[in-house]
């Protein structure tokens, strides 16, 4: 990994590059095409978006990775609520994947989240990509989500 990597907050001037990067990173990964670049564009104006945790990784003046966070809440069976964070999309330019940049971005974002007083992050993602960072699968039985429980950008109990 190059030593000249900068972790910083995304700026408005980065928006087009981040959206192109996100499209390239996700295109045809899970379904034909992708929607993650559109999600990135929409998240910036969502009330749960956390600008302090909208981060880019820059290498030699080029944005090569990005992560965005939103506020959310987790509600258990007894109705007890806990404020949490969710992140995504998290992406690394295809030519820079599997070189440690995603880990650097994720760990830097966790440090900043902790600095804001946040201690819980819940995501929808491929467990193989995140278990090495301490994440555990919340659905070990691999039960499918109810159609009404699909992830969305609005607040609500986890399904």
Task: Label the predicted regions.
Residues 1-13, 20:
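Conserved N-terminal entry element of GNAT/NAT acetyltransferase domains
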Residues 60, 149-159:
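NAD(P)-dependent dehydrogenase/reductase Rossmann-like domain
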Residues 96, 100-108, 118:
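Conserved acetyl-CoA pyrophosphate-binding loop and the N-cap/start of the following alpha-helix
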